Amino acid sequence: MSTTSQTLTEAATSKFVRIKEGDLDLQLHYNDCGSGVETVVMLHGSGPGASGWANFNRNVEPLVAAGYRVVLMDCPGWSKSDPIVCSGSRSELNARALKGLLDAIGLDKVHIIGNSMGGHSAVAFALANPSRVGKLILMGGGTGGPSQFVPMPTEGIKLLQGLYREPTIDNLKKMMAVFVFDSSSLTEELYQARLDNMMSRRDHLENFVKSLAINPKQFTDYGPRLGEVTAPALVIWGRDDRFVPMDAGLRLIWGMPNAELHIFNRCGHWAQWEHADKFNRMVLDFLTH
């Protein structure tokens, strides 16, 4: 085991910060890895039990080894960050939380990697703070709006919402089975870790259900504003994504003037995990050229 991997554990990189951003007054949890001149922020998705570390633990070490500082934010209402009921745009809430975090820890311009909800939130942040974004990497998210090919809500989103309402191991396995292309890659250890994270914060689960009842459309459709996002963007999608259909990725590259698209074959909604090695090489190449 390398010295880098020995120090890059969730516990060793775990930190908390209090943010005050407008009417937000929250304690956020984040993981702070490496010490490079440039910083990459990673934003996780909206699944029950999600966290920055759970989403991106296969992607941190290559970035740190390449000389980047990596910050993984637990969004408000997930993992070790404070609970919240969101009655408005979840994307904008997370963008404001990210601004508060960056201000609190003294970071100005960052690159952002966002998966699913994290992609939506990254676009929201780029629209509100264009001068603070270097490059964007968006996977399985980035804008709302209906699919032209798949009935909405999608199969995956229905299972996700069902898991929030009834957080059982059986419902977790049903959701995870459509989360990735090859469900044989999912281990009992992974299921248990996700279940433990979910059940350790029942308040987060209950608040997500309350948020949906108040505002069923938690994620803003940024389609009409994508032309304002001028940062270089790498859009990555799984051909077999059953949560956010592939044509959402096409919307992003049609709308954002400096975006390019890569589609992974035999890949679901978790490209950074399902194709970690290829994903890591692609991201490093994009960030450095």
From Swiss-Prot:
Coiled-coil blocks: none
Domain (AB hydrolase-1): residue spans on this chain: 39-275
The protein's enzyme class: hydrolase
Record keywords, A-Z: Aromatic hydrocarbons catabolism, Hydrolase
UniProt pathway: Aromatic compound metabolism; 3-phenylpropanoate degradation
InterPro entries linked to this entry: AB_hydrolase_1 (IPR000073), AB_hydrolase_fold (IPR029058), Epox_hydrolase-like (IPR000639), MhpC_alpha/beta_hydrolase (IPR023791)
Biological process terms in GO annotation: 3-phenylpropionate catabolic process
Reaction(s) catalysed (UniProt annotation): (2Z,4E)-2-hydroxy-6-oxonona-2,4-dienedioate + H2O = (2Z)-2-hydroxypenta-2,4-dienoate + succinate + H(+); (2Z,4E,7E)-2-hydroxy-6-oxonona-2,4,7-trienedioate + H2O = (2Z)-2-hydroxypenta-2,4-dienoate + fumarate + H(+)
This protein's GO CC annotations: cytoplasm
Gene Ontology MF terms: 2-hydroxy-6-oxonona-2,4,7-trienedioate hydrolase activity; 2-hydroxy-6-oxonona-2,4-dienedioate hydrolase activity; protein homodimerization activity
Pfam families: Abhydrolase_1
EC number: 3.7.1.14
Record-marked site positions (Catalytic role in ketonization of the dienol substrate (substrate destabilization)): 194
Domain of life: Bacteria
Active-site residues (renumbered): 269
Site (Transition state stabilizer): 116
Stored PANTHER family: ALPHA_BETA-HYDROLASES SUPERFAMILY PROTEIN, HYDROLASE
Homology family: Belongs to the AB hydrolase superfamily. MhpC family.
Subunit structure: Homodimer.
Primary role: Catalyzes the cleavage of the C5-C6 bond of 2-hydroxy-6-oxononadienedioate and 2-hydroxy-6-oxononatrienedioate, a dienol ring fission product of the bacterial meta-cleavage pathway for degradation of phenylpropionic acid.
Protein name per its UniProtKB record: 2-hydroxy-6-oxononadienedioate/2-hydroxy-6-oxononatrienedioate hydrolase 1
